[in-house]
């Protein structure tokens, strides 16, 4: 018989041997799992041999050395999940989210008997949820959202005694919600939105005594809300929106103390229960797009913590209770598309935090209250389609943050207040279909960020002001059905972004030649005016139908069906004999004056003394050369090589210029920028600024090579960039769009940041760019970024601030603080740069179809879904999506609402420099031909110890790391970004 100590030793030895065998098996299991993945070479390169506990994403138990956790999230892995995963008996956590995995979830996953967390979200997994999942008795968190899973939700999930989080959102699941799942005593989070679930909401829902989050949005659930809903006292978020639920909203729903109650997009009828006014914890109340009727309960004014109140798209009647003015934290109030009546309550003036007010399509009457101007943070005001009367309050100019103002389809009268032109940030102004009279104020031209202007169907008189030509961002102008006269201003031809122009049914005279340079114009209607002359057939006019010109008997052109005859026997003389005699006498006098001037001796004019008010000289404009790249060219050469700046050499348009490509033998191409306006008034002042700009040299700035200024035209000469602008690469059509991999995007971001950092911190004088955008980031043949158009920016003054006379920049990129105050500093550029980062990350435009990219990212961030917006080209080429998240974080830091919360461009460079991988030394001719990483500017040298391929390596530095920078500026990927 074996002695007891010997037996104990024997059992211990056997246990150790079993552990050793298990450990060895875990290593081989991981290698088998790797075989089922694709795109592993660059991310799982260390999964080859040796100590697997040191492999990427692997965490082992400190005692047994068995695999305890596997985290391969965000690595862009393809392929499938191997059934071998079931052999990891000791694994506690599996995180494979945000990859490109496909296929089915293997049944063997149920053999991971120790598993507590399983996260397979944001992949392309399909098939059913395996019933074997119900074997995971220790599972606490099961997250399978954002896949392609089908079938029913297994009722056996109710047998998981420790399940706290179940998130199956955004799949293709069908059937009913298993009733047994409502009896899970520990379940806290149930996310089922975005599936095809049917059936009703069970009365057993309140058996989930620990449940605080219940989201079934975007399904096909039917029936009423259970009367027992008031017993779900632990609920904090209840989202039943966009289903087919019906019946009335139960009275006892008011017993809930939820922060979010979303019932929109259903078929609820009846009145809004007054008891909802007792739900003091409500931050979001959304009852929109139902069939609710009756008045708005005045008791809702008690909801002093509510930030968003949505009631649009119902059948609500009666007046707006003035008590709503007590909702002191309200940001969004949407009451549009109802049958509300009465006056707009002046108490709304107390809602100083209101951001969006929508009262459209109701029956409101009376004047617009002056108190609205007290809503100083109001960004959007829509009162379209009511019965409002009186005049437009001039006090609206106090709404400095306003971007959208729509007062159309009312009975407003009087003139357009000139004060509206002081709302600097306005991008949409719609006053159409009213009874407004008087002229269009010329000051409207100061709304330089306006995208849409609609003044149609009023009683406006006078001329179209020439100042309209200052609206360089404008895309749509509608002045139809008024009494406007005069000519179409020549300045309209400077609107390079104009896509729609409607001037029909007015009394406009003259011709249409001024519109020939509106190259973006797609829709033109000048019908039923008094226009005359030839309709051009070149440029963009060939795209317009004859209907665009109807009702103008004086217009002619072969494709309009009327020939342009210079004279005829039957025609009346166009001018009188007396006028002809006067013209002849005047011409003779002018001829005599010219002869006297020619015969009189004079000295040749000196170019630099020419001013705009002096006559144009016959001497060719002088070409001022700032760098040797232009040393062999003269003005005549450039005109010859571009055939006097012929259209066929045009490579781009800007808000203030047209750009041509000038190519000659044995020289690098040159970009010639022709400014639209002959500004500034003082050539000497402008020359001084250009010479200062020409002296600025940096590898990430486009060099100004020379210039030519004269009353006949102002030309600037720059280095030519082979790959155009970043805008072109990201946003042009499919035929032109170039796919950018992640590394290239990172290097573009770093290069642009280095150029901007040089302007802000190392340039003398230091410069604010004022218009940072993807169109002003040019790419050379190696896709290295070069910042352009910094040349006409003002130098930073000693106080580091500057008050401009008008807001500069481009819609979508403008710092909201700058737009509100017109006070400019370096942080305004940082904000714009952050928007460019978002473009690089998403491939989306800053503003597209009225969708604001920054607002989109903020909303996705609030839902922890920001990675859904990543450009697919990044997902295909990025080795570590964690880097993408860090750049998202950096972009949101740069776009913080408070300028003081944003980093400097030096700090931005340091963060990006940690993410960009240094190029290895070239080993072949092919490698030598590849673009090399830009040299780091001198101001980075002090941070050389920060070099590394990840934030972790940077954070180990004794210097300030990017991780510490993130801490310094606050947590960004949260709901409190702004």
Swiss-Prot record:
Natural source organism: Oryza sativa subsp. japonica (Rice)
Enzymatic reactions: L-seryl-[protein] + ATP = O-phospho-L-seryl-[protein] + ADP + H(+); L-threonyl-[protein] + ATP = O-phospho-L-threonyl-[protein] + ADP + H(+)
Active site: residue positions: 771 (proton acceptor)
LRR repeat residues: 66-87, 88-112, 114-136, 137-159, 160-184, 186-208, 209-232, 233-257, 259-278, 279-302, 304-327, 328-350, 352-375, 377-399, 400-423, 424-447, 449-470, 471-494, 496-518, 519-543
Entry's family note: Belongs to the protein kinase superfamily. Ser/Thr protein kinase family.
Binding annotation for ATP: 651-659, 673
Function: Receptor kinase involved in the regulation of thermotolerance. Functions as a positive regulator of heat tolerance. May be involved in the regulation of cell proliferation and cell growth.
Membrane spanning stretches: 578-598
Protein name: LRR receptor-like serine/threonine-protein kinase ER1
Pfam families reported in the protein's UniProt record: LRR_1, LRR_8, LRRNT_2, Pkinase
Topology of this chain in the membrane: Single-pass type I membrane protein
Membrane topology (Cytoplasmic): 599-978
Keyword Cell wall biogenesis/degradation (UniProt): no
A cellular component annotation (GO) from this entry: plasma membrane
EC number(s) per entry: 2.7.11.1
Gene3D superfamilies xref list: Phosphorylase Kinase, domain 1, Ribonuclease Inhibitor, Transferase(Phosphotransferase) domain 1
Glycosylation sites: 62, 71, 218, 231, 302, 326, 371, 389, 406, 454, 507, 525, 540
């Amino acid at each position: 018989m074996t002695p007891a100590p010997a037996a104990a030793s024997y059992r211990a030895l056997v246990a150790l041997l079993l552990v050793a065998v298990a450990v060895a098996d875990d290593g081989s299991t991981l290698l088998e799992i790797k075989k089922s993945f694709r795109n592993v070479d660059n991310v799982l390169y260390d999964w080859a041999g040796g100590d697997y506990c040191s492999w990427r994403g692997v965490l082992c138990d400190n005692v047994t050395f068995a695999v305890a956790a596997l985290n391969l999230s965000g690595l862009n892995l393809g392929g499938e999940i191997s059934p071998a995963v079931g052999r990891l008996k000791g694994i506690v956590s599996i995180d494979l989210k945000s990859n490109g995995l496909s296929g089915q979830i293997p049944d063997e996953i149920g053999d991971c008997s120790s598993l507590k967390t399983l996260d397979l979200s944001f992949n392309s997994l399909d098939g059913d949820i395996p019933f074997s999942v119900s074997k995971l008795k220790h599972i606490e968190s099961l997250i399978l959202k954002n896949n392609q899973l089908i079938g029913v939700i297994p009722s056996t999930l109710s047998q998981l005694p420790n399940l706290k989080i179940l998130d199956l959102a955004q799949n293709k699941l069908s059937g009913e919600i298993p009733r047994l799942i409502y009896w899970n005593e520990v379940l806290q989070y149930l996310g089922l939105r975005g599936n095809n679930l049917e059936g009703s909401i069970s009365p057993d829902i309140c058996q989930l005594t620990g449940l605080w989050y219940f989201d079934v949005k975007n399904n096909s659930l039917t029936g009423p809300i259970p009367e027992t809903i008031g017993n779900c006292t632990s609920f904090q978020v209840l989202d039943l929106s966009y289903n087919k639920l019906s019946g009335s909203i139960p009275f006892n729903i008011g017993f809930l103390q939820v922060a979010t109650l979303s019932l929109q997009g259903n078929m609820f009828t009846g009145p809004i229960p007054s008891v909802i006014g007792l739900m003091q914890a409500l931050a979001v109340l959304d009852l929109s797009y139902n069939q609710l009727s009756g008045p708005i309960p005045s008791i809702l004014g008690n909801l002093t913590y509510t930030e968003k109140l949505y009631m649009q798209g119902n059948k609500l009647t009666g007046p707006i209770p003035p008590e709503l003015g007590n909702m002191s934290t309200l940001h969004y109030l949407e009451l549009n598309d109802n049958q509300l009546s009465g006056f707009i309550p002046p108490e709304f003036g107390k809602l100083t935090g209101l951001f969006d007010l929508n009262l459209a399509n109701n029956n409101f009457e009376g004047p617009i209250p002056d108190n609205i101007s007290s809503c100083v943070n109001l960004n959007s005001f829509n009162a379209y389609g009511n019965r409002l009367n009186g005049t437009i309050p001039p006090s609206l100019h106090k709404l400095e943050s306003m971007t959208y103002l729509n007062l159309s389809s009312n009975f407003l009268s009087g003139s357009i207040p000139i004060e509206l032109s002081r709302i600097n940030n306005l991008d949409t102004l719609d006053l159409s279909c009213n009874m407004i009279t008087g002229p269009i104020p010329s000051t409207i031209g100061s709304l330089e960020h306006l995208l849409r202007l609609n003044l149609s169907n009023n009683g406006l008189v006078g001329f179209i002001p020439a100042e309209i030509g200052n609206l360089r961002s404008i895309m749509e102008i509608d002045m139809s059905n008024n009494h406007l006269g005069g000519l179409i201003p020549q300045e309209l031809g400077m609107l390079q972004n104009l896509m729609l122009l409607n001037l029909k049914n007015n009394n406009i005279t003259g011709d249409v030649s001024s519109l020939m340079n509106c190259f973006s114009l797609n829709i033109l209607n000048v019908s039923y005016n008094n226009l005359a002359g030839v309709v051009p057939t070149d440029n963009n006019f060939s795209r317009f139908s004859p209907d665009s010109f109807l009702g103008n008997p004086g217009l002619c052109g072969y494709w309009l069906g009327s020939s342009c005859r210079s004279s005829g026997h039957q025609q009346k003389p166009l001018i009188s004999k007396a006028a002809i005699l006067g013209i002849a006498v005047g011409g003779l006098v002018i001829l005599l004056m010219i002869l006297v001037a020619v015969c009189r001796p004079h000295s040749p004019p000196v170019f630099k003394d020419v001013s705009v008010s002096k006559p144009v000289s016959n001497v060719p404009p002088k070409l001022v050369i700032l760098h040797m790249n232009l040393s062999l060219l003269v003005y005549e050469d450039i005109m010859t090589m571009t055939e006097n700046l012929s259209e066929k050499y045009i490579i781009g348009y800007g808000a203030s210029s047209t750009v041509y490509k000038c190519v000659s033998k044995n020289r690098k191409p040159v970009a010639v920028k022709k400014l639209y306006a002959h500004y500034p008034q003082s050539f000497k002042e402008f020359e001084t600024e250009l010479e200062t700009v020409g002296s600025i040299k940096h590898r990430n700035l486009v060099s100004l090579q020379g210039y030519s200024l004269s009353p006949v035209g102002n030309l600037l000469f720059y280095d030519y960039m082979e790959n155009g602008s970043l805008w072109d690469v990201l946003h042009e059509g499919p035929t032109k769009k170039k796919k950018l991999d992640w590394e290239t995007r990172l290097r573009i971001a770093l290069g642009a940041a280095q150029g901007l950092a040089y302007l802000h911190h190392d340039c003398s004088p230091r410069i604010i760019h004022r218009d940072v955008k993807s169109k002003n980031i040019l790419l050379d043949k190696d896709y290295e970024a070069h910042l352009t158009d910094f040349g006409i920016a003002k130098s930073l003054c000693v106080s580091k601030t500057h008050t401009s006379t008008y807001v500069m920049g481009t819609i979508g990129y403008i710092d909201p603080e700058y737009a509100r105050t017109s006070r400019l500093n370096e942080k305004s550029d940082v904000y714009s740069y952050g928007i460019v980062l978002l473009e690089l990350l998403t491939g989306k435009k800053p503003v597209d179809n009225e969708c604001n990219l920054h607002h989109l990212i903020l909303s996705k961030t609030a839902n922890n879904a920001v990675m859904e917006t990543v450009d697919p080209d990044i997902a295909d080429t990025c080795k570590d999506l964690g880097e993408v998240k860090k750049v998202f974080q950096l972009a949101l830091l740069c776009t913080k609402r408070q300028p003081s919360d944003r980093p400097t461009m030096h700090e931005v460079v340091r963060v990006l420099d940690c993410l960009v991988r240094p190029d290895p030394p070239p080993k072949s001719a092919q490698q030598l031909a590849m673009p090399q990483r830009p040299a780091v500017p001198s101001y980075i040298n002090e941070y050389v110890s920060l070099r590394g391929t990840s934030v972790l390596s940077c954070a180990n530095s004794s210097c300030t790391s990017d991780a510490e920078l993130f801490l310094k500026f606050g947590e960004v990927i949260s709901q409190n970004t702004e």
